[in-house]
Amino acid sequence: MSYQDLKECKIITAFITPFHEDGSINFDAIPALIEHLLDHHTDGILLAGTTAESPTLTHDEELELFAAVQKIVNGRVPLIAGVGTNDTRDSIEFVKEVAEFGGFAAGLAIVPYYNKPSQEGMYQHFKAIADASDLPIIIYNIPGRVVVELTPETMLRLADHPNIIGVKECTSLANMAYLIEHKPEEFLVYTGEDGDAFHAMNLGADGVISVASHTNGDEMHEMFIAIAESDVKKAAAIQRKFIPKVNALFSYPSPAPVKAVLNYMGFEAGPTRLPLVPAPEEDAKRIIKVVVDGDYEATKATVTGVLRPDY
């Protein structure tokens, strides 16, 4: 799978990591989850990202996860590996290892967290990673998690690097519009905000890297088809019903809500690993009613005001 395959992807699912109650990875649960995603319009899969609880995964666990999912997917959709850290040297070594591992269309590298680099520091960080191997790199810009924000101007400098092929943008629609207007033609722009997918696609984004596609992929697919057919009225109607579901899925630190819904649907998503904890039982029930049944009144007390998936 290559850049060209990624270019065809509209819905890339940021895959959860299923766990047993003891916290170990439930590898037996992965096949059913993958087939569910592929049956419901997932075009690509991101592994070891935020939704996978990557801060709690060991290096060996990530490699085991990569191997397991590659075997199941067997080339049916492109795979992206989460490869970034806040240590440039460590990120370079991981990118090289993933490139040698093979089977990935790209690596997703997050903006460095905690150490709060300058724009020039971030530029040098991503340039060094992209220079290190031939694995194409997608930048993950999410200031809600990492505190600092890669500006559109710095992003466009990086977009000129031949091995930096895109961005997962979680800042603002204004930034996204600017990037889409000024980027190189082949540079991919994805939103990482499920709630912004309607607006992002209308602005000309390439797709969404999504959590909600675990549970609501059909709705997203239908909305994207309506947008492609210039049926804005239909797409907007889908979006109005979709937004409360997104709010519910991010009413507690992700991926706790989506795991609760998947467990209810019969998939063995399992618990989260500490320091993340499940949503309280009554709130989880209300989240499920919204996401599965479209009962929008059920979670009003839980999700009112939660408009952005900063979790």
From Swiss-Prot:
It is found in: Cytoplasm. Pathway: Amino-acid biosynthesis; L-lysine biosynthesis via DAP pathway; (S)-tetrahydrodipicolinate from L-aspartate: step 3/4. The record marks T50, Y114 as: Part of a proton relay during catalysis. Keywords: Amino-acid biosynthesis, Cytoplasm, Diaminopimelate biosynthesis, Lyase, Lysine biosynthesis, Schiff base. Its EC number is 4.3.3.7. Pfam families: DHDPS. Its main location: cytoplasm. SMART domains: DHDPS. PROSITE patterns: DHDPS_2 (PS00666). The active site is at Y140, K168. One of its GO terms (molecular function) is 4-hydroxy-tetrahydrodipicolinate synthase activity. It catalyses: L-aspartate 4-semialdehyde + pyruvate = (2S,4S)-4-hydroxy-2,3,4,5-tetrahydrodipicolinate + H2O + H(+). GO terms for biological process: diaminopimelate biosynthetic process; lysine biosynthetic process via diaminopimelate. Homotetramer; dimer of dimers. This is 4-hydroxy-tetrahydrodipicolinate synthase. It comes from Streptococcus pneumoniae serotype 2 (strain D39 / NCTC 7466). The gene is dapA.
